[in-house]
Amino acid sequence: MVVHGAGWPLSENHASGGAFLYHLEDRQVALGLIVDLNYDNPYLSPFDELQRFKTHPKIAPTLAGAERLSYGARAITKGGLNSLPKMSLPGAFLVGCDAGTLNFSKIKGTHTAMKSGMLAADTIIEVLLEGDPGGKDHTHYDSHMRCSWLYPELKSARNFGPALHKFGPYLGGAFNYVDQNWLRGKLPFTLKDNTVDHNSLNEVDNATPINYPKPDGVLTFDKNSSVFLTNTNHDEDQPVHLHLADADLPLKVNLPRWAEPAQRYCPAGVYEIVNEGLDQRFQINAQNCIHCKTCDIKDPSQNITWVTPEGGGGPSYSNM
């Protein structure tokens, strides 16, 4: 069974995204929720939205009596053609999901990722046959992509995501139906998202707090027990790989303006406000980090930088 969903529970808090449920072998189920990081409510927690999704009457019966086997989270690139970066640099190419070749309108990306890798391989063979010693920026990789079927496929889907963000699920859905099914993505204009994700949060004065129900330990769970299933490990003596440009900013700026959203957008409980009597302290539990990189994207003050930790550290997912 394959289930794709949109709307609830994210729509209740004016957020967008989608959900999936796939039946696997050995009576296993893969379930997940994709949350667009342009949401505006600082009290929203993607992790807790996933827990809510599991309570849907169409989903809960599938999970009845099941055992939670694994958990993970990752920031994904789904902006499509509008968000593709320069895909070549000296000595390397960006391919697949590292570049962002997902066809969002079809919710498919394996074939486009493979094609981008094949084009990169063809480019490498070309330059090796030409006697290239390496280390150059081979920008004609981009030309190869534009001459393949990959570029027109991504171009035909370029308006899908921006239409949903600009017009909402109903008008945006109608727009996309006409664009994708009648016009085959050949509209003479391109919609774009002009607001970066970290600038999308409303301040607390203009936001409604969200009271998530406590997990029942059967169908819904807490972050800590979920992170345990990621088999995450970092050496205790290694430097913290989550850097703050200003250590005072979380309490002085983010807390009063946005209720410090790092406590909620992080799916692993890395960031927390610790109360110590009358004082408060911003704590980074770097050992919990599952390397999703959401903090580097969503922090409204752009105060957090995720850097590569020591080799071997991080999650070790099973069955994912």
Feature-to-residue mapping (PLM):
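Glycine-rich, charged/polar anion/phosphate-binding loops
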Residues: 4-7, 15-19, 76-83, 205, ...
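FAD-binding beta-loop-beta segment adjacent to the flavin cofactor pocket
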Residues: 73-104, 225-241, 249-265, 272
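Short, glycine-/Ser/Thr-/acidic-enriched flexible segments
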Residues: 26-27, 36-38, 99-101, 109, ...
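Iron-sulfur cluster-binding cysteine motifs and their immediate structural context
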Residues: 256-287, 293-318
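Extended, non-globular alpha-helical segments
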Residues: 72-86, 90, 144-147, 163-174, ...
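Conserved FAD/dinucleotide-binding core of flavoprotein oxidoreductases
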Residues: 3-5, 11-75, 111, 130, ...
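Mid-to-C-terminal Rossmann-like scaffold of FAD/NAD(P)H-dependent oxidoreductases
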Residues: 134-242, 248-250
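Active-site-proximal substrate-binding core of FAD-dependent oxidoreductases
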Residues: 100-106, 112, 118, 122-169, ...
